[in-house]
């Protein structure tokens, strides 16, 4: 079994294929209904090979959630770093959270989040991932605010409190966006989030993304 993964590069590629497959199945069926056999079939692998890489179903699924979040942040970092102003960077971050048409947007991620929250009270491994993701979100927002304050773009608000408030607001839009609530679509969620952010931080937001 040791040789089935092939070279180190092939092993990494195969592992990522399985993680992608796991994410697709979780989005389609939900975390509780995702089985190793489903993931193996989607990845074009045997169940034994999936077990070789991940040992257990829970480990496979928690690693898939972690992999999804890491990939999202890689895209977010690249897009944010390409923008010069802190206000523009914060707008890009919120757009990626709310607008699924954005590259790396969170449409499928929201469905994963619904499962993440549902499983957290009953699964310590999932709860630990949720906590780390929450901390990462807040730290990203906090850093953007502090950088903007140093540049004179943002008002002198408490960056930690703002990060908690904005992340909670974005979390609040998860359910209606994920469930396609006609009263709170992605563009509306983006607009309301940016109204809150610009009002608290004292910068102008023209809402151009919401109308694109």
Residue ranges, per PLM feature:
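Helix-turn-helix
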Residues: 17, 21-63
């Amino acid at each position: 079994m040791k040789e089935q993964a092939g070279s180190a590069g092939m092993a990494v590629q195969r592992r990522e294929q399985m993680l992608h497959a796991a994410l697709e199945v979780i989005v389609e069926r939900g975390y509780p209904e995702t089985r190793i056999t489903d993931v193996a079939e989607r990845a074009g692998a045997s169940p034994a090979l999936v077990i070789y890489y991940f040992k257990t179903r829970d480990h496979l699924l928690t690693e898939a959630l972690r992999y999804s979040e890491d990939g999202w942040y890689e895209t977010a970092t690249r897009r944010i770093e390409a923008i010069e102003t802190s206000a523009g960077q914060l707008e890009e971050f919120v757009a990626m959270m709310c607008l699924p048409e954005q590259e790396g947007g969170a449409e499928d991620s929201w469905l994963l989040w619904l499962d993440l929250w549902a499983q957290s009270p009953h699964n310590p491994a999932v709860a630990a991932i949720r906590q780390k993701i929450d901390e990462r979100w807040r730290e990203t927002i906090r850093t953007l605010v502090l950088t903007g304050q140093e540049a004179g773009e943002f008002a002198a608000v408490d960056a930690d409190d703002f990060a908690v408030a904005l992340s909670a607001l974005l979390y609040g839009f998860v359910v209606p966006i994920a469930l396609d609530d006609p009263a709170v679509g992605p563009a509306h969620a983006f607009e309301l989030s940016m109204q809150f952010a610009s009002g608290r931080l004292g910068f102008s937001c023209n809402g151009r993304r919401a109308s694109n």
